[in-house]
Amino acid sequence: MASKTKASEALKVVARCRPLSRKEEAAGHEQILTMDVKLGQVTLRNPRAAPGELPKTFTFDAVYDASSKQADLYDETVRPLIDSVLQGFNGTVFAYGQTGTGKTYTMQGTWVEPELRGVIPNAFEHIFTHISRSQNQQYLVRASYLEIYQEEIRDLLSKEPGKRLELKENPETGVYIKDLSSFVTKNVKEIEHVMNLGNQTRAVGSTHMNEVSSRSHAIFIITVECSERGSDGQDHIRVGKLNLVDLAGSERQNKAGPNTAGGAATPSSGGGGGGGGSGGGAGGERPKEASKINLSLSALGNVIAALAGNRSTHIPYRDSKLTRLLQDSLGGNAKTIMVATLGPASHSYDESLSTLRFANRAKNIKNKPRVNEDPKDTLLREFQEEIARLKAQLEKRGMLGKRPRRKSSRRKKAVSAPPGYPEGPVIEAWVAEEEDDNNNNHRPPQPILESALEKNMENYLQEQKERLEEEKAAIQDDRSLVSEEKQKLLEEKEKMLEDLRREQQATELLAAKYKAMESKLLIGGRNIMDHTNEQQKMLELKRQEIAEQKRREREMQQEMMLRDEETMELRGTYTSLQQEVEVKTKKLKKLYAKLQAVKAEIQDQHDEYIRVRQDLEEAQNEQTRELKLKYLIIENFIPPEEKNKIMNRLFLDCEEEQWKFQPLVPAGVSSSQMKKRPTSAVGYKRPISQYARVAMAMGSHPRYRAENIMFLELDVSPPAVFEMEFSHDQEQDPRALHMERLMRLDSFLERPSTSKVRKSRSWCQSPQRPPPSTTHASLASASLRPATVADHE
């Protein structure tokens, strides 16, 4: 019994069922879930069951029906976990279930109404109430908020919420997220404001099953650091980390298609509302979101199955970002609570059965939580050291006095401000050099202004300021001084006043920084009435006792049922044969019912295995087709030398288990200088494909040439000289000669432009000569010879 209680403290699995919705009642769906709160059992009836098929029964640490309240779930199940986090343990609370079953309602609830607040706002109130009632302890509370959207980690509190963050792993601290923002909060109002800011940028969408469906897994991380002085007189620091996880749901896409025609997920407007889930539609981002959500939840199921089996040596934490972030919460250093949310309607039988089996497997996980005491990288220790250093500087500046001295010669010396000053102001202090009368050796200069307990900094600065003002007024009233000397003394006094003001400003900045750092540390027992604290504390103790009593009662009833079964088997004395027959018949029927239930469970597991195998085969075939397509593109369209360059740049990132490209410019090398454009490997001015090289070598179309696109066949021989002979008719009739010239000119001008461009070679390049029958030509016909040559061609 004790071992069972100890194991239940490390990991608790509870089930919660919502009531039937109006939409389900209008559609005529019946309720198939029965919740036995006293025994912690859930009974699921198959609406399509064959005659004689028994309902399936599952037992959990606690069960909450439709009439349960938010406070019941928190006080009985979650409150002990938050107390453990305040003691230095790691804790995780996550809700798992079908979309629309109330995951987000369970985790967040309705913030406006106190009775409807979920786990997260109640945890806020619990943490800061505990801090205000504690004594002699210092606390530092930090908050971070992230989401996993399509296997990408996003910081919901960043100014760039769409920026992708990297997941890293440290051998000492474990898995962490690089550059994740964290905010120090001092009260409930501040941490609620942080969460509301994150909810405004969280991805949500509308589906048929839920109008406000979460499209991502959201994790709100609270880190509580506590410093307490131990019996050895040393301060010991405990660090507790609380992960509040709101998972997106998994279901069939044909049930939860989007209400609109696709589209990407939109940011949420705040907390509250129904549970999240994945939907699928014909278009938009819904199918992608659903596939990524189902992939991560499938990886979570594989991790839980591997941890529950106790046979597998490999736990597939690296299959998704979600399982890597929950690595400590599942089988590691954490106390975990899983809330399985269920839908009671008959149309959700398959999803409810899958959720119940998932939760039933999770019961067998064994966590090993331990207190995180005195870690090296605590922010609280850094704050304490910084506050102590600032306090020492303030004491050094605030307790000032004068030291009695003998003869001294004054000189000015620039003294740098102590470390921690903003912008490092330089303060000029008067330094005295004391003379040793015995050996005339100068001692090292020491400042006149030293620590003294009789005056604080403010009084000293005020006195010095008044003294300088008096000296300044005395110099102005002294008529024996020359004007130049008076001006010089006044300038020195002004400079001393300016130095004094600078020192006062630096001290005020230092004091403000000290107060700001100290205000971030929450010290218990302040500003709360002791009598009210005692009453509230007693009330909470009574609530915890009642919740513990209910838990023990439930465990005792479960134990009694097991004992009754054992005693029935041990009974062997009967008063008559009829009684023996009745008892054994009853036992036989009970065993037969168990046998049928086991057979049905085996058949369901077999069907589930076949379905999962078919899904895996389909995914494998799809990946194989995509891989073949990429290989085909690489072999036919990418040159081998380019392929080799790409292959040489590839490397395996062991942290993310992904292949990545090495940067073209190595890390640490400045790329500010302009680099020369790389030349082609074959000597051309620009890269040329293999096909173009072959075509260019064969002398085909000029489109494949990189240079010398036009080849002109030049004829270097001298032009042919023709003898001009004029006919007798043309000499006598110049009008006919002129008309013939005009007709040839018109025929040349009427040629199409393409012909003129194509035949625009000079007459000396023409390969043909004029016909020998032409024995006469005029000067005009000689000028029109290109047209004649074109006609012959």
Curated annotation (Swiss-Prot):
Belongs to the TRAFAC class myosin-kinesin ATPase superfamily. Kinesin family. Kinesin II subfamily. GO terms for cellular component: ciliary tip; cilium; cytoplasm; cytosol; kinesin complex; microtubule. Microtubule-based anterograde translocator for membranous organelles. Gene3D superfamilies: Kinesin motor domain. One of its GO terms (molecular function) is cytoskeletal motor activity. InterPro entries: Kinesin-like_fam (IPR027640), Kinesin_motor_CS (IPR019821), Kinesin_motor_dom (IPR001752), Kinesin_motor_dom_sf (IPR036961), P-loop_NTPase (IPR027417). SUPFAM superfamilies: P-loop containing nucleoside triphosphate hydrolases (SSF52540). SMART domains: KISc (SM00129). Residues 269-284 have a biased composition (Gly residues). Heterodimer of KIF3A and KIF3C. Signal peptide: none annotated. Residues 630-793 are annotated as: Globular. Keywords: ATP-binding, Coiled coil, Cytoplasm, Cytoskeleton, Microtubule, Motor protein, Nucleotide-binding. Residues 256-268 have a biased composition (Low complexity). GO terms for biological process: microtubule-based movement. This is Kinesin-like protein KIF3C. Residues 399-414 have a biased composition (Basic residues). Residues 10-365 form the Kinesin motor domain.
